[in-house]
Amino acid sequence: MENKTGKYFKYAIGEIVLVVIGILIALQINSWSNKNKNDNLEIEYLRGIKTNLISDLIELEGHFKADTTKLNSYTFLIRALNSDSIAPNSQDLITNFYTSVGYSWFEGQNVVFEDMTSSGRLNLIQSDTLKYSIQKYYRLFNEVIKQEDLYNSEIKKYSDRNSQYIDVSSFIEPMFNTQWNGNTGPPSLAFMEKPNFNQVKPKIINNLSLIKTNRRNSHNVRIQIYQKAISLKEMIEMYLIEKK
């Protein structure tokens, strides 16, 4: 009887051990599966952020060209208005008034980062250094947008002040096709021939200089985010190579 009972207990213990081993194996397989899934998600998210960074770089390079053109135009106009030798009908003067009009802003692409943060998946990034670098970039990203809003509001303010002296419509209307053209005629610099021009000229120059300053400030913050985007893109590329 005792031998049968002993055998029964040994058999039961053996069964329990086998069940436990089976559970542990299943848990291990599940753990491997989850890790593999998370690794794949991490890679896909990082590739997505890299794609967004490339879009940022392309957009910023376009802004740099526009910034340079406008800064050159402001400089030309300030120098021309400070000179007594330039004629009101100068084509160079008209061209630079054209190119000096308007302002732009950095929009950027942050959809992948926003998806990661809103879904709580930012911790899928296993490298703390890389994760913190990404967070730091997008903090700067948001700060650049805020600063550009400020600079653009200043540019608009000083542009509006100059519009009271300059026939702005004569520069704007020719940009429209025949259907929407207001027929204001060719761009007019007649304001330079008015009797009070010498009194208002310093105000126009000051406003142009302030517009130029805010444009340069906007350009400088764009350079900051551009450099950070290049650095972060390279960091992601190196990390993805190491993951292979």
Where are these regions (language model features)?
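Hydrophobic membrane-insertion alpha-helices, especially the h-region
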Residues: 13-28
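Long, hydrophobic alpha-helical segments that serve as membrane-spanning/inserting helices
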Residues: 1-6, 10, 31-244
